[in-house]
A protein has these predicted regions:
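DUTPase catalytic domain/fold
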Residues: 1-364
Length: 364
């Protein structure tokens, strides 16, 4: 039964295109619409800019680009985006949202696992990755590779957008009720606070060697964001193993791929998102890619609960991360209706039933 409020499912996203509410420079890719989101595609040009910026009320992104751009890069045949630089790319998709519909954006999971910092910008924006109700205009993506230089091209998909009507967030009591019926995390006593389920870090390791994660290497070759299984793991990553202490010292400005201790489940009538980490709890950032689609870890779509892969970066000081330490919270929202496709069932999902897993670009 459909709801009046909630996150739009795949069929409703397709209807936005049919109704002219979602516009694109070209036909959609076959797998571009996901169960609860739409992948956004890069346009044909990238603007290298001096610094990131917020347009602010009354200002267009294009006007800011005229003042801040250093040079323009043609993406039609592919181009390298260097680490430490900031780029603004007009996206192929634009919006003409109904008055009651808003949207939010997030990096795709493979983007976060490459440590590519991205956020969507709109004209007159006062927040990144937030599209106000009734917005009409273009979309832009800010891109800043942090660890690896990357090759992108027109049509590359680094970010995704979710559409919602009204308030869809589950309350703390609703999350607990849902956990009792659908087991959201593999725990008899989930830590639920502020409507979010706590996720903690696993530093005991997996397999005979006790692998706990990976640390990104510096001064590597480029990663082509559109090529799967194209790169060797050890050319880009240093494996990290448990040494018995069940802790890991995060070095400043290093990038880590780790995994949650809990297995996560998102039932088909709900979507989830990893909330930004509370800086009062620790001096590090966890998880660029926050969207979890309906069906993530769901038994009917090939999962038995999937652990959340975490992108972790320390800030100004070294920080000791300990096994079982809470590193983020997963909040749940209602879908307006059940998606036709679920995560893991033929919708381009690369990480169903995952444990510790690097992005799809790496072999092994």
């Amino acid at each position: 039964m459909a709801r009046d409020t909630g996150i739009l499912a795949d069929s409703a996203i397709a209807s936005l295109f049919d109704d002219g509410r979602l516009l694109s420079e070209g036909p959609l890719d076959e797998d571009q619409i996901q169960p609860a989101s739409l992948d956004l595609r890069l346009g044909a040009r990238a603007f290298r800019v001096r610094a990131s910026f917020m347009p602010g009320p009354g200002h267009l992104v294009a006007d800011k680009l005229d003042r801040l751009k250093l040079h323009v890069i043609d993406l039609s045949e592919g181009a390298v985006l260097e680490t430490g630089c900031v780029y603004i790319v007009p996206l192929m998709e634009s919006l003409d949202l109904p008055a009651a519909m808003s949207a939010s954006a997030n990096p795709k999971s493979s983007t976060g696992r490459l440590d590519i910092f991205t956020r969507v910008i709109t004209d007159r924006a006062q927040e990144f990755d937030k599209i106000p109700a009734g917005y009409r205009g273009p979309l832009y993506l800010e891109i800043s590779p942090r660890t690896f230089p990357v090759i992108v091209r027109r049509g590359s998909r680094l970010s995704q957008i979710r559409f919602r009507i009204g308030h869809a967030l589950l309350t703390e009591s609703e999350v607990l009720d849902l956990h009792r019926t659908d087991t959201l995390v593999a725990s008899d006593t989930p830590n639920v606070s502020g409507a979010g389920i706590a996720l903690s870090i696993d530093l005991k390791g997996t397999g005979a060697d006790g692998l706990i994660g990976y640390r990104g290497k510096h001064h590597t070759a480029v990663v082509d964001v559109d090529r799967k299984n194209a790169h060797g793991i050890y050319d880009f990553w240093e494996p990290l193993y448990s040494r018995g202490a069940d802790e890991l010292i995060l070095d400043p400005d290093e990038f880590y791929i780790l995994v949650s201790r809990e297995a996560v489940h998102v039932p088909p009538l709900f979507a989830a998102e990893m909330t930004p980490f509370d800086p009062l709890v620790g001096e590090f950032r966890v998880h660029y890619a926050g969207f979890f689609d309906p069906g993530f870890g769901h038994a009917q779509s090939g999962g038995t609960g999937s652990r959340a892969v975490l992108e972790v970066r320390s800030h100004e000081v070294p920080f000791i991360l300990e096994h079982g330490q809470i590193v983020g919270r997963l909040v749940y929202e209602h879908m307006m209706e059940r998606p036709k496709g679920l995560y893991g069932l033929g919708v381009g999902s690369n990480y169903q039933a995952q444990g510790l897993k690097l992005s799809k670009h790496f072999r092994g």
